[in-house]
Amino acid sequence: MADIPATSEGSANTSEAVVEYQQPTPEFLQRKIYFLVDQLRTYHSELPENLQTRISYDLLTELANCVLNDGIFVIVKALMELQHETERHLIKIRMQAENEYEIEVAEWRSKIKDPEELRHILGLMKIKHTKKLHESDTKIIEILDQKVNDQQSTLQKAGVPGFYVTENPKEIKIQMFLLDFILRLSRLKYEPGK
């Protein structure tokens, strides 16, 4: 079997197109963490005092370390977009139920001429509509609760401190503030030396 000579022609041409990525220095990362912690402390100080006591400085430091990886910003923004899309869909479903009721009322008004009979039918329809809306609203709440659960699980698996699956409204409120902090940090540009 003959030896095949190795050439560098192919790699020489492609190396020009490859942008070299430099690993951040430990000093750069440390300064960025200080910057992030400082920002988080500012956000923290804006919270009502009863919430400030529930979010420790240790948690803020862990959060700053976590968001050094910009991937966390991508995850949070994707979850936010999914949440908005789900909410738009659920609003559309709710509006559809309202519109169906209005159409049905209009149809009965055009068919029934006797005011007493119409009043009776519209009363029954109102009861039916109220029950249907209650069932629809219950279903919407269940879907939103599941969405919150999924988001908590995703953020916990991504290693974001302060996130775990809970139904406790106080804990969920804290998590919402942490999400707000992350979104606010995602809009900042860290510039060393400033």
Swiss-Prot record:
This is Gonadal protein gdl. Pfam families: DGCR6. In stage 6-14 egg chamber nurse cells and oocytes of adult females and spermatocyte cysts and bundles of maturing sperm of larval, pupal and adult males. Belongs to the gonadal family. The gene is gdl. InterPro entries: Gonadal. PANTHER family: DIGEORGE SYNDROME CRITICAL REGION 6 DGCR6 FAMILY MEMBER (PTHR13054), PROTEIN DGCR6 (PTHR13054:SF2).
